[in-house]
Amino acid sequence: MADTGLRRVVPSDLYPLVLGFLRDNQLSEVASKFAKATGATQQDANASSLLDIYSFWLKSTKAPKVKLQSNGPVAKKAKKETSSSDSSEDSSEEEDKAQVPTQKAAAPAKRASLPQHAGKAAAKASESSSSEESSEEEEEEDKKKKPVQQKAVKPQAKAVRPPPKKAESSESESDSSSEDEAPQTQKPKAAATAAKAPTKAQTKAPAKPGPPAKAQPKAANGKAGSSSSSSSSSSSDDSEEEKKAAAPLKKTAPKKQVVAKAPVKVTAAPTQKSSSSEDSSSEEEEEQKKPMKKKAGPYSSVPPPSVSLSKKSVGAQSPKKAAAQTQPADSSADSSEESDSSSEEEKKTPAKTVVSKTPAKPAPVKKKAESSSDSSDSDSSEDEAPAKPVSATKSPLSKPAVTPKPPAAKAVATPKQPAGSGQKPQSRKADSSSSEEESSSSEEEATKKSVTTPKARVTAKAAPSLPAKQAPRAGGDSSSDSESSSSEEEKKTPPKPPAKKKAAGAAVPKPTPVKKAAAESSSSSSSSEDSSEEEKKKPKSKATPKPQAGKANGVPASQNGKAGKESEEEEEDTEQNKKAAGTKPGSGKKRKHNETADEAATPQSKKVKLQTPNTFPKRKKGEKRASSPFRRVREEEIEVDSRVADNSFDAKRGAAGDWGERANQVLKFTKGKSFRHEKTKKKRGSYRGGSISVQVNSVKFDSE
């Protein structure tokens, strides 16, 4: 699609395409929410679909995109992860477009954002309806970015340079590498990635736009820069993730935006957004995985609501996201290579690090999970909202200092993930979404930790770097990238556990989640499987928050030590075993209730069933079988006409003195072959019967 054509496009032009795409893919719930949020109507049946547009775009835009993308995007194209390359192209186009429109004016910005939509729409088709929705959010974000600061364009130019680094880093960990690049490009880039997250938050929460705009300016420079550079390379993944996350967020955003606006307060979200550049990448990674799952379930578009949702999921999902956020920040601080390896590490380390991170918030998540998910989400969002504002204030302060920025970015990143997590918590209601929710809750925890202890973050970074190094040990899968980012963040959080405890207030309930987080992190290699197992664990952990609290207290300190991690993992294993006993699908409590109900009901029903069959059917059947073989026709039940009752020769009229009487006397005793033999002998011999009578001895039945 030519730039001129894209500039003419308006975001609303894509709504029908997205709506049609969602409906075509049987995402009726998402489609209905999207239609309500955007007021879009079904497109003409003859109009081209998003898939068609995307396929055309792939064919027509590759060469021009290479030129536009230049450094970072080209490298990514070389990588050519199908979805990531597409998303990178989309992000690069969006970045290029964003730069031009930002310079031109707000109106051009809208156009640029729309073109991005078009590019995103193509990406959406490949990514799925969630990616489409996210692309729309990205368009909105682009618009916001442009009006917020045209300055961002300069950062973009700077950011463009870092993409090569990302290209150098493994593609599978492009998200983590993008996080690394943020630190490498020097915290402005981190701010840029954070800026992307803020833009998402802004689009998600309309109420926040004012403060986010403030936060964005800081992040905006970073936004444009990192969004253009890191987003061109990492944002290829990020854009995909953002698209997916954004799509769900957009759909749920209208409803949850209100909730998020009230509890989170704009200031906290903006600051977190700005600092959450790294987190945004990790979140996006998770979101990429989750959006598909989330589509089926409810979405929380607003980061604050996501926090509340994340609290619910904190027990299960928070461990992953928290770990991802803390570890990504650490890995980003350490180096892009470490971040790449960190994604791998995250698979291994998440289990260890997650335990310490989740302890503070996980318990609340369990509690919330116990309470209705919606009410608990709102409560958790409110609770976390105060914590986030604090972190927001701290993160801006920390930004001036170069070292503080990485922590701030981490803390901020956690907020973004919470936003993603917000959506995930809802999906969490769905089992598949449980892992996503866990990551979101962990992100929220990471934000609190960062708020309470900026210094601790620095220390955490040092510690996480070691885990990041370990990460290379575990080969990173593309799926493990999100987990790896979360595990990296979690690595950062381990030093923070004291801060988390402080933020936790009642640490005991939160520690319970720590075990969950540990179990989840340990199972990070298979996040979805782990999430289901973790969910099982959560119900049990909820039942016994105190022991877990004790464990959580021990865990944070021990997490730094391998022994502590191992012990935590063992605890997680025990929890998993216990939970394994429970049913896999559904929330732990629900499962328990269902199981108990089933057990209570089934025994009675079984007893009843046993009694009935044993008594009536079995006795009757047994008696009948024992007494006689099966008879379709029972003699005693049928009345036979007397005329037909006896068919013997003697019973017939005129039998006495009949011509065949003598023969009958001889033959009536023989049956089978011998009867024919005997009859033949009688015919050949000198047999002489009586006189042959012409009387009719047959029986005549009157038609009745």
UniProtKB/Swiss-Prot annotation:
Q: Which residues carry this modification: Phosphothreonine?
A: T596, T612, T615
Keyword ATP-binding included in the entry's annotation? yes
Q: Where is this region: 11 X 12 AA approximate repeats of an acidic serine cluster?
A: 84-570
Q: Where is the composition biased (Acidic residues)?
A: 87-96, 170-182, 434-444
Q: Does the keyword Cytoplasm apply?
A: yes
Residue spans of biased composition, Low complexity class: 120-132, 149-160, 183-207, 215-236, 246-279, 408-419, 474-485, 504-529
Cross-link annotation Glycyl lysine isopeptide (Lys-Gly) (interchain with G-Cter in SUMO1), location: K424
Q: Where in the cell is it found?
A: Cytoplasm; Nucleus, Nucleolus
**LisH domain: from which residue to which, for each copy?**
10-42
Stretches the record annotates as Disordered = 65-638
Q: Which GO terms describe its cellular component?
A: box C/D methylation guide snoRNP complex; box H/ACA snoRNP complex; Cajal body; cytoplasm; nucleolus; nucleoplasm
Q: Explain the purpose of this protein.
A: Nucleolar protein that acts as a regulator of RNA polymerase I by connecting RNA polymerase I with enzymes responsible for ribosomal processing and modification. Required for neural crest specification: following monoubiquitination by the BCR(KBTBD8) complex, associates with TCOF1 and acts as a platform to connect RNA polymerase I with enzymes responsible for ribosomal processing and modification, leading to remodel the translational program of differentiating cells in favor of neural crest specification.
The record's family statement is: Belongs to the NOLC1 family.
**Annotated positions of the Omega-N-methylarginine modification:** R688
> Phosphoserine-modified residues are where?
S87, S88, S91, S92, S372, S373, S376, S465, S567, S587, S627, S648, S691, S703
Q: What's an example of a GO molecular-function annotation for this chain?
A: TFIIB-class transcription factor binding
What is this protein identified as? Nucleolar and coiled-body phosphoprotein 1
Question: Residues where N6-acetyllysine occurs?
Answer: K33, K424, K668
How does it associate, per the subunit comment? Answer: Interacts with RNA polymerase I 194 kDa subunit (RPA194) and with casein kinase-II. Interacts with DKC1/NAP57, NOP58 and fibrillarin.
Q: Where is this cross-link: Glycyl lysine isopeptide (Lys-Gly) (interchain with G-Cter in SUMO2)?
A: 67, 76, 189, 200, 352, 357, 399, 405, 410, 416, 424, 449, 461, 510, 584, 609, 618, 652, 668, 700
Q: Which residues carry this modification: Diphosphoserine?
A: S88, S91
Q: Where are the Acidic serine cluster repeats?
A: 84-95, 127-138, 170-181, 231-242, 274-285, 335-346, 373-384, 434-445, 479-490, 524-535, 559-570
What UniProt keywords are attached to this protein's entry?
Acetylation, ATP-binding, Cytoplasm, GTP-binding, Isopeptide bond, Methylation, Nucleotide-binding, Nucleus, Phosphoprotein, Repeat, Ubl conjugation
Biological process annotations from GO: axonogenesis; box H/ACA sno(s)RNA metabolic process; neural crest cell development; neural crest formation; nucleolus organization; positive regulation of cell population proliferation; positive regulation of DNA-templated transcription; regulation of protein import into nucleus
Describe the PTM.
Answer: Undergoes rapid and massive phosphorylation/dephosphorylation cycles on CK2 and PKC sites. NOLC1 is one of the mostly phosphorylated proteins in the cell.
